[in-house]
Amino acid sequence: MQHGTQRRSSPGEAKTMAAIHSGKYGKLLVSKGYCCKSRWSIGTKPIETPPDYLNFDIWNGPAQKLDFHRTLVHYNWHWFWEAGNGDIGNQGVHEMDVARWAIKDATLPTKVWSMGGRFLPEGKDQGETPNQQLTVMEFGETLLVFETRGLTGNKSFPDWPTQVTNEFYMEGGVIKG
């Protein structure tokens, strides 16, 4: 069984990683991942009693007890600190995993910095976690750069084949995913 990092099962991804790891294009300098999906406001809903069909105590698990509101359950949980960590941990983990996979023999980064926030054209909503975030990790001589942009999508980047992708910058060229 595989959970959460299914892109490692793709023959195309494995072929790309083999080419990068072989040194065919020189040393990997920067491994980038993007998650640029439109993630608009989740709105604001009042606190209420959970519906009868939902055992909210089980749903909440060991996290600090949350108040039930319809912006939390079922999909938008990742916009709240007690339940998630934003789009970097929702969609982002898939592209970040591929970016890290490209860094041969990577273990843990030696340095990390990250900045972001929750920015909405509609103003504030109930969400807490970032919908815009830039993270840079150092793995020796290779940087892993990961970016989530929740206010943009394909229309803003017509040359990108998907809203989520990876790019690999090497001494001898670039592979765009």
Regions found by a protein language model. Give the residues of each.
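Rossmann-fold NAD(P)-binding glycine/threonine-rich loop
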Residues: M1-H3, K15-A18
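Beta-strand-loop-alpha-helix segment that lines the small-molecule cofactor/substrate pocket
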Residues: M1-S9, G23
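Contiguous beta-strand/loop segments that form the cofactor/metal-binding neighborhood of enzyme cores
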Residues: K15, K27, K32, C36-G86, ...
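A generic secondary-structure signal
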Residues: A19-S22, W101
